[in-house]
Amino acid sequence: MTSEMESSLEVSFSSSCAVSGASGCLPPARSRIFKIIVIGDSNVGKTCLTYRFCAGRFPDRTEATIGVDFRERAVDIDGERIKIQLWDTAGQERFRKSMVQHYYRNVHAVVFVYDMTNMASFHSLPAWIEECKQHLLANDIPRILVGNKCDLRSAIQVPTDLAQKFADTHSMPLFETSAKNPNDNDHVEAIFMTLAHKLKSHKPLMLSQLPDNRISLKPETKPAVTCWC
């Protein structure tokens, strides 16, 4: 696994042949690997989102992530086998210091997560964005913003229009969803698969010109905010 993590875009091989080069064996399958880090405050649901995507269900129990929690899922996109590595990072600073350089290495995309029922987690987003700027070498790495726990309607503190304004300011598409609600399983899937499709095709998010001449990144065919609750 270490070798997979070290390169910016690795190719992994698998073969059903017991002996390399055996007669009649097909060439080994090749899979591109994309490393996506999921960051945000503790208890915003990062682990639950990654677990929902990789395991297809909500975890029976969760504990605070210490360091990095790593999950991987292989998917087929347009006939190509792709491996998606999700790095679920600790939200508490005391668990992060020794790991920061490691999990930011060779990142292909970033998912920022906040808890829609916790305004403090939303206010922490600028600090997470600044951390990314300090450790990521490339400026064109795709980034998306995810508001989690939208099923808790009566407890929501972060209105969609406020989150959308923040997303526009930082050139990110916004998604609102719930990792817990089983009805949103396909929606969590769509978030990560949309990102995987963009990484595979190497297509940038579509540029749109704002009235004050700022450039904003928008999804190519999707509205700026997608809410499935």
From Swiss-Prot:
Ubiquitous. Mg(2+) binds at T47, T65, D88. SMART domains: RAB, RAN, RAS, RHO. It catalyses: GTP + H2O = GDP + phosphate + H(+). GTP binds at N43, V44, G45, K46, T47, C48, T62, T65, G91, N148, K149, D151, A179, K180. A lipid is attached at C227, C229 (S-geranylgeranyl cysteine). A motif (Switch 1) lies at residues 56-68. Gene3D superfamilies: P-loop containing nucleotide triphosphate hydrolases. It is a lipid-anchor. SUPFAM superfamilies: P-loop containing nucleoside triphosphate hydrolases (SSF52540). One of its GO terms (cellular component) is Golgi membrane. Prenylated. It is found in: Golgi apparatus membrane; Golgi apparatus, cis-Golgi network; Preautophagosomal structure membrane. InterPro entries: P-loop_NTPase, Rab33A/B, Small_GTP-bd, Small_GTPase. One of its GO terms (molecular function) is GTP binding. Switch 1, switch 2 and the interswitch regions are characteristic of Rab GTPases and mediate the interactions with Rab downstream effectors. The switch regions undergo conformational changes upon nucleotide binding which drive interaction with specific sets of effector proteins. Although most effectors only bind GTP-bound Rab, ATG16L1 effector binds both GTP- and GDP-bound RAB33B. Belongs to the small GTPase superfamily. Rab family. NCBIfam families: small_GTP. This is Ras-related protein Rab-33B. The gene is Rab33b.
